[in-house]
Amino acid sequence: MPTLGVNIDHIATIRQARRTVEPDPVAAAVLAELAGADGITVHLREDRRHIQDRDVRILRQTVRSHLNLEMAATEEMLAIALDIKPDYVTLVPEKREEVTTEGGLDIIGQIARIGEIVDKLQSASIPVSLFIDAEPAQIEASVKVQAQFIELHTGQYAEAKDETNRHRELAILAKGCQQAIQAGLRVNAGHGLTYWNVYPVAALPGMEELNIGHTIISRAALVGIERAVREMKQAIRGNGA
């Protein structure tokens, strides 16, 4: 079964709603790890709508599992990553007007630029993952830029309105996962996964890690983050929430 990366962005969302100091994402990360999180994920957005630079710097010093920094492919974010040196970076698309990441990164349309950023990060011993849709051409492009990982965008699967569409989207993810592994890429997945839909994705052969945030933080508001993380670990194993 894949490991669990807990995205704590929405702890920071609650904090930033009042521009105060709590809840602290750093404290949330500690509790998540104590409950069994295998990694901590944060997205430092260009508009700093939730996670702040301070959070990433302190998390780099305190996270005991691994820190996955999601970021846009910009010079500003590249400089921050090279300075902080997270355990790995996931390059994601980003629009200021979006509520959350809306789709996968277009590697094909900016292959030279992405390749340059991947090279600079990996030359600094920072592994790179590319958040992409499970499209054959995007997977091929990810190989060309020499990324070590991809993270398959599971949004279409998660948002499927019926079982027929859900099975179709799962088949697309399965095919993409297989293609990527055969090409030498390591495969993670995430976006929109919940306690109720995570297991079929977790069961895909070769899947290494699932990055999950909103559903865990939503559950944590009711039962606490430690229980919410433990329940997600169970769901990944097919034991339900």
UniProtKB/Swiss-Prot annotation:
Protein name: Pyridoxine 5'-phosphate synthase
Upper classification of the organism: Bacteria, Bacillati, Cyanobacteriota, Cyanophyceae, Nostocales
Binding positions (1-deoxy-D-xylulose 5-phosphate): 9-10, 45, 50, 100
Species per Swiss-Prot/TrEMBL record: Nostoc punctiforme (strain ATCC 29133 / PCC 73102)
UniProt-annotated location(s): Cytoplasm
Signal sequence interval, chain numbering: none
Enzyme Commission code(s) on record: 2.6.99.2
The protein's role, per its UniProt record: Catalyzes the complicated ring closure reaction between the two acyclic compounds 1-deoxy-D-xylulose-5-phosphate (DXP) and 3-amino-2-oxopropyl phosphate (1-amino-acetone-3-phosphate or AAP) to form pyridoxine 5'-phosphate (PNP) and inorganic phosphate.
Keywords: Cytoplasm, Pyridoxine biosynthesis, Transferase
A GO MF term: pyridoxine 5'-phosphate synthase activity
Cellular component per GO, a single term: cytosol
Active site: 43, 70, 191
Site (Transition state stabilizer): 151
Family the entry assigns: Belongs to the PNP synthase family.
InterPro entries according to UniProt: Aldolase_TIM, PyrdxlP_synth_PdxJ, Pyridoxine-5'_phos_synth
PANTHER family: PYRIDOXINE 5'-PHOSPHATE SYNTHASE
Description of how the protein assembles with itself and partners: Homooctamer; tetramer of dimers.
Gene Ontology terms: biological process: pyridoxine biosynthetic process
Gene name linked to the record: pdxJ
Annotated positions binding 3-amino-2-oxopropyl phosphate: 7, 18, 192, 213-214
Pathway: Cofactor biosynthesis; pyridoxine 5'-phosphate biosynthesis; pyridoxine 5'-phosphate from D-erythrose 4-phosphate: step 5/5
Coiled-coil zones: none
